[in-house]
Design a protein with these regions (language model features):
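Acidic, surface-exposed loops and disordered segments
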Residues: 1-234
């Protein structure tokens, strides 16, 4: 029988303590909370309490529970009280889910065709596996200048990597060797013209205290893999 082992590193008392702490968070605490942590909580709670349920229900053409979107609605009320912009991605993401939930509650279908994946052609498949199979761990670099546009494109690939619980902790620092010569001296990889440093904003992980520590490695690794594949592709 399948058993989720992700919480095995915590005792039952520790699990209950985390659960009780999360459930006891007041509106006052959420309003006073660091903005980065609050936004991460909106992403995580919208994902776990509404997004999963909306997609599962829409796929099966079923009705959603009338109160399923209540907590996400409340988070957006707090969002507005904090004076955060409605154009920010978290607000637009949660608003879309709420709109979809309201349709599902009434038994209406939700049109998800705008998000339908692009059909993969035979040539696209071939190109993809060419990138995957021909990527190499580079040990020597030229001093060729790398334009910002290329760096942005590579980092964009990292942003689209899978991330546990949708807390989106990944951050980047771009260091040009000419601006900080020798900063990475001593690394096992020889220096190049540009260094891309993958960081994590640990405030985001407070949004879901149940997240295993190992997720931090998986989240950074997923971003890193996307980046090296994109670097090879461009």
């Amino acid at each position: 029988m399948f058993r989720d082992t992700s919480m095995d590193y915590l005792s039952r008392d520790e699990v209950l303590e985390i659960w009780n702490h999360n459930m006891r968070l007041t509106d006052e605490q959420l309003l006073a909370m660091d903005e980065t942590e609050f936004r991460a909580r909106v992403r995580e709670r919208s994902h776990h309490t509404l997004e999963i349920q909306v997609y599962a229900t829409a796929y099966r053409h079923q009705k959603l529970k009338p109160n399923q979107a209540d907590y996400t609605k409340h988070l957006l009320e707090l969002w507005e009280k904090r004076g955060l912009g409605k154009d920010l991605p978290e607000y637009r993401y949660a608003s879309f889910l709420i709109d979809a939930a309201e349709k599902l509650v009434k038994g209406e279908d939700v049109d998800l065709t705008p998000y339908k994946p692009t059909p993969v052609t035979e040539q696209m498949e071939k190109d993809f596996f060419t990138i995957v199979k021909e990527r190499r761990s580079v040990r020597e670099f030229t001093d060729q200048e790398v334009p910002d546009e290329l760096i942005d494109k590579i980092l964009e690939a990292g942003r689209w990597a899978a991330h546990g619980c949708n807390v989106q902790s990944i951050r980047y620092v771009v260091v040009r060797e000419k601006n900080e010569p020798g900063l990475f001296r001593g690394s096992d990889v020889p220096g190049g013209p540009v260094h891309l440093v993958i960081l994590q904003d640990m405030r985001c992980y407070r949004a879901n205290s149940f997240t295993p520590v190992r997720n931090q490695l998986l989240d950074a690794g997923a971003a890193g893999q996307n980046i090296v594949l994109a670097a090879h592709a461009v």
